Curated annotation (Swiss-Prot):
Poly(ADP-ribose) glycohydrolase that degrades poly(ADP-ribose) by hydrolyzing the ribose-ribose bonds present in poly(ADP-ribose). PARG acts both as an endo- and exoglycosidase, releasing poly(ADP-ribose) of different length as well as ADP-ribose monomers. It is however unable to cleave the ester bond between the terminal ADP-ribose and ADP-ribosylated residues, leaving proteins that are mono-ADP-ribosylated. Poly(ADP-ribose) is synthesized after DNA damage is only present transiently and is rapidly degraded by PARG. Residues 610-795 are annotated as: Catalytic. It holds the Pfam family PARG_cat_C. Changing residue 740 to A: Reduced poly(ADP-ribose) glycohydrolase activity. Interacts with PCNA. Interacts with NUDT5. PANTHER family: POLY ADP-RIBOSE GLYCOHYDROLASE (PTHR12837), POLY(ADP-RIBOSE) GLYCOHYDROLASE (PTHR12837:SF15). The modification Phosphothreonine is found at residues 139, 199. The modification N6-acetyllysine is found at residue 340. This is Poly(ADP-ribose) glycohydrolase. A motif (PIP-box (PCNA interacting peptide)) lies at residues 76-83. Changing residue 12 to A: Abolishes nuclear targeting. Changing residue 874 to W: Reduced poly(ADP-ribose) glycohydrolase activity. It comes from Homo sapiens. Ubiquitously expressed.
């Protein structure tokens, strides 16, 4: 069939769109703003024939540009007509010079093609599609499609000059149709003139003769096979052409074949950009757009699995009704396929496509390229009319069997040129999958549910002071401030302050004291003139008044805090006094406790005689003061006397926690009365009998941290229990405060969780807020010697003060209680997956390591770490990850771990099972850290759900077992 006298042959090189794994990934309507990738035009040949009446074949015209309503349309009777070819057709009739010229012409335009946005498509076109022909029955619609005519036979354009360049300037629109959609689509086949009303037999012959023949790069064929196929192709061409015709229309052009890399640029974009660009996607299109970027054959237990059954497109509604024999249909030979009715041929192709799509990684696609056409219908329409002429038609069928050669697959012949990183990833996946098939899933040994603790008995864990070294003589130094007379320090005696007389420093390196001479306050004299007066004198005058009602206390506090008279709220204090306390308790409060508190507060210049340094960031400094001095400072905090500590934002102390108790007095929270009970218990105790001990506050800032990947230290011992508490059962150990970076958190406001509770029952911790700047990532605060004054029950809203507590812990040589508390602040994670990011895990490791490390102290002199679910709860941390991080940090610091799960018996068993699993296999800190990194890379980095499918501990079990099995297998092969 020639082009006819009315049309001079023109040369045209159609291009194939970038292949993706999703059938709809190349749909121009659904996924705009895509860039196409093309390869060497030598990769494939294609043959086209153009009907004589085609308007695109007018002499002097290169073809219709995008948007033309008269683009070329190919005739196609059935989907199986594309599968009737036997073997692979090749014809190299062009000379070497012609090929070089063509390649140069094609390659010159490849860069411009890549720069264009391939899917520059307006979403509105989806709404302007042609209306469906709904008046026909489903049978007529299906038959009409399957028996449709091709309105333009495929031929080669043979015009020279700039025809090809002009055609390539207009970017073709691309729509991908999968086989199940072919069975439902009803393409308008209106002929251009009567010359195209051929019979069905002629259509079949034309379809077989003028099919697009693609030179497939992966076909490993000899030169003789190629020559034989070339001869066969020429023979077919001579049969179909007139004897006098030069067969020029049967010559083949080379086109660009895009390798079907599973991780190509377009494929990787489809998942993320498809739903965003088209909010009006149909059900089927949305499903296609969300298909995985790559597919692989792997075991379900693999941590790198992609569940294609959830992401890939499922059967359409029409197919679901006609697929009861889905798994029983097989492809026959090409002759059997040709003899089947076209409807069953389409169904066979559909079934084979879906079967292979779910099990194979290779891909072949049916891919249509359109040039022109003003409207496109949805991909899931039963009858889709495509107005205009289709100028190029490329068909790519995913996972269909080779249609010409029995028992061969078309994917065996398609070129695949994956990127280097794709190849590495596929190699790793293959290795991982093979390993996984051999390794049974590890199941931790069964643990009795009756066990209340697991691991090393707590009696064997080291405690202070028995494990500690003898302390040196207490004396002040450049990095240690001591506020008492060390030469007069005696057990059971109240330490004497040092120096004897008050020394004042009003600068940015020390706490600004209420009794400072620089603490001035504007006052009015008898003449009404304002002058600067001593605020300390005003404080003394206000507090020395008797308090019989809560209103009296409120007025006294506001007298020297006039600026906050309309801002501060005393509702909680008033309700506590009037509604919570009984009459006798209220009377004891205002007759005894409050006057004693005023007395110790106003004795501040005589008790705290030395300026208190600020523990700023990057400082390694300690402050040792007496419990009496702390009591005086806390009494001043209760009466809100500390200057410059109430302003917010960019004030002088904005990087320090609140110290004045004004926020404790506000609101109607049910927590406030219990907090006030706990604090008044402390003040009653210290005013009735002066405490005799010392307390040391140490800010520790580290610069050098372990290289966690290379840390070869083994894991230390573990005791884990769901009973008990850190403060009760961790006596003599390093007790972890799950701190806020502003130490104390909400202790002076509404907070009432682990840190706030600890600061309430050990109120001497609260004074650290006076001089401790916000903690940096490499810093911690260590407090040694605080005393517990109260017992409690509950937690948060259920917290209740129970009774006064007599602390029976021993004292060291510095007269400090052997209670060492370390405040380490965890990160706050709003997204669960964020905590598995390597930088975040490293930060948490460094923070815990900073709190656990004691430079210069050997491991046998270090007590065990008593800790629990640090950074969990409101901070969003995963308890199992945090437990592992603390175990690693303690091992690096050479400390044992006593872990309290606070009633969670399942967590207790999980932590113990993981610890025993790692220690039995002699894994080091670095080994476990690498597993954490691997978990992030394989499970969390590309996770699109709130949490990974595989949890951390099962992943570690499997990874370690897989590695051990691989090592054993390698040893057996090498004979070692």
């Amino acid at each position: 069939m020639n082009a006819g006298p009315g049309c001079e042959p023109c040369t045209k090189r159609p291009r194939w769109g970038a292949a993706t794994t999703s059938p709809a990934a190349s749909d121009a309507r659904s996924f705009p703003s895509r860039q196409r990738r093309v390869l060497d035009p030598k990769d494939a040949h294609v043959q086209f024939r153009v009907p004589p009446s085609s308007p695109a074949c007018v002499p002097g015209r290169a073809g219709q540009h995008r948007g033309s309503a008269t683009s070329l349309v190919f005739k196609q009777k059935t989907i199986t007509s594309w599968m009737d070819t036997k073997g692979i057709k090749t014809a190299e009739s062009e000379s070497l010079d012609s090929k070089e010229n063509n390649n140069t012409r094609i390659e010159s335009m490849m860069s411009s093609v890549q720069k264009d946005n391939f899917y520059q498509h307006n979403v509105e076109k989806l709404e302007n599609v042609s209306q469906l022909s709904l008046d026909k029955s489903p049978t007529e619609k299906s038959t009409q499609y399957l028996n449709q005519h091709q309105t333009a036979a495929m031929c080669k354009w043979q015009n020279e000059g700039k025809h090809t360049e002009q055609l390539l300037e207009s970017e073709p629109q691309t729509v991908t149709l999968v086989p199940e959609q072919f069975s439902n689509a009803n393409i308008d086949r209106s002929p251009q003139n009567d010359d195209h009303s051929d019979t069905d037999s002629e259509e079949n012959r034309d379809n077989q003769q003028f099919l697009t023949t693609v030179k497939l790069a992966n076909a490993k064929q000899t030169t003789e096979d190629e020559q034989a196929r070339e001869a066969k192709s020429h023979q077919k061409c001579s049969k179909s052409c007139d004897p006098g015709e030069d067969c020029a229309s049967c010559q083949q052009d080379e086109i660009d074949v895009v390798p079907e890399s599973p991780l190509s640029d377009v494929g990787s974009e489809d998942v993320g950009t498809g739903p965003k660009n088209d909010n009006k996607l149909t059900r089927q299109e949305s499903c296609l757009g969300n298909s995985p970027p790559f597919e692989k054959e792997s075991e379900p237990e693999s941590p790198m699995d992609v569940d294609n059954s959830k992401n890939s497109c499922q059967d359409s509604e029409a197919d679901e009704e006609t697929s009861p024999g889905f798994d029983e249909q097989e492809d026959g030979s090409s002759s059997q396929t040709a003899n089947k009715p076209s409807r069953f041929q389409a169904r066979d192709a559909d079934i084979e496509f879906r079967k292979r799509y779910s099990t194979k990684g290779g891909e072949v696609r049916l891919h249509f390229q359109f040039e022109g056409g003003e409207s496109r219908t949805g991909m899931n329409d039963l009858n889709a009319k495509l107005p205009g002429n289709i100028s190029s038609l490329n068909v790519e069928c995913r996972n269909s069997k080779q249609h010409g050669k029995k028992d061969s697959k078309i994917t065996d012949h398609f070129m695949r040129l994956p990127k280097a990183e794709d190849r590495r990833k596929e190699q790793w996946e293959t290795k991982h999958q093979r390993t996984e098939r051999k390794i049974p899933k590890y199941v931790p040994p069964h643990l009795s549910p009756d066990k209340k603790w697991l691991g090393t008995p707590i009696e064997e864990m080291r405690r202070m002071p028995r494990c500690g070294i003898r302390l040196p003589l207490l004396r002040p130094s450049a990095n240690h401030t001591v506020t008492i007379r060390v030469d007069l320090l005696r057990a059971g005696e109240v330490p004497k302050p040092f120096p004897t007389h008050y020394k004042d420093l009003w600068d940015n390196k020390h706490v600004k004291m209420p009794c400072s001479e620089q603490n001035l306050y504007p006052v009015e004299d008898e003449n009404g003139e304002r002058t600067a007066g001593s605020r300390w004198e005003l404080i003394q005058t206000a507090l020395l008044n008797k308090f019989t009602r809560p209103q009296n206390l409120k007025d006294a506090i506001l007298k020297y805090n006039v600026a906050y008279s309309k801002k501060w709220d005393f509702t909680a204090l008033i309700d506590f006094w009037d509604k919570v306390l009984e009459e006798a308790e209220a009377q004891h409060l205002y007759q005894s406790i409050l006057p004693d508190m005023v007395k110790i507060a106003l004795c501040l210049p005589n008790i705290c005689t030395q300026p208190i340094p600020l523990l700023k960031q990057k400082m390694n400094h300690s402050i040792t003061m007496s419990q009496e001095q702390i009591a005086s400072l806390l009494a001043n905090a209760f009466f809100c006397t500390f200057p410059r500590r109430n302003a917010k934002m960019k004030s002088e102390y904005s990087s320090y926690p609140d110290i004045n108790f004004n926020r404790l007095f506000e609101g109607r929270s049910s927590r406030k009365p219990e907090k006030l009970k706990t604090l008044f218990c402390y003040f009653r105790r210290v005013t009735e009998k002066k405490p005799t001990g010392l307390v040391t506050f140490t800010r520790q800032s580290l610069e050098d941290f372990p290289e966690w990947e290379r840390c070869e230290k083994p894991l230390t011992r573990l005791h884990v229990t769901y009973e008990g508490t850190i403060e009760e059962n961790g006596q003599g150990m390093l007790q972890v405060d799950f701190a806020n970076r502003f130490v104390g958190g909400g202790v002076t406001s509404a907070g009432l969780v682990q840190e706030e509770i600890r600061f309430l029952i050990n109120p001497e911790l609260i004074i650290s807020r006076l001089f401790t700047e916000v903690l940096d990532h490499n810093e911690c605060l260590i407090i040694t010697g605080t005393e517990q004054y109260s017992e409690y029950t509950g937690y948060a809203e259920t917290y209740r003060w129970s009774r006064s507590h007599e602390d029976g812990s021993e004292r060291d040589d510095w007269q400090r209680r052997c209670t060492e508390i370390v405040a380490i602040d965890a990160l706050h994670f709003r997204r669960y997956l964020d905590q598995f990011v390597p930088e975040k895990m490293r930060r948490e490791l460094n923070k815990a390591y900073c709190g656990f490390l004691r430079p210069g102290v050997s491991s046998e002199n270090l007590s065990a770490v008593a800790t629990g679910n640090w950074g969990c709860g409101a901070f969003g941390g995963d308890a199992r990850l945090k437990a592992l991080i603390q175990i690693l940090a303690a091992a690096a610091a050479e400390r044992d771990v006593v872990y309290f799960t606070f009633g969670d018996s399942e967590l207790m068993r999980d932590i113990y099972s993981m610890h025993i699993f790692l220690t039995e296999r002699k894994l080091t800190v670095g080994d476990v850290y690498k597993l954490l990194l691997r978990y992030y890379n394989e499970e969390c980095r590309n996770c699109s759900t709130p949490g990974p499918d595989i949890k951390l501990y099962p992943f570690i079990y499997h990874a370690v077992e897989s590695c051990a099995e691989t090592a054993d297998h390698s040893g057996q092969r090498t004979g070692t």
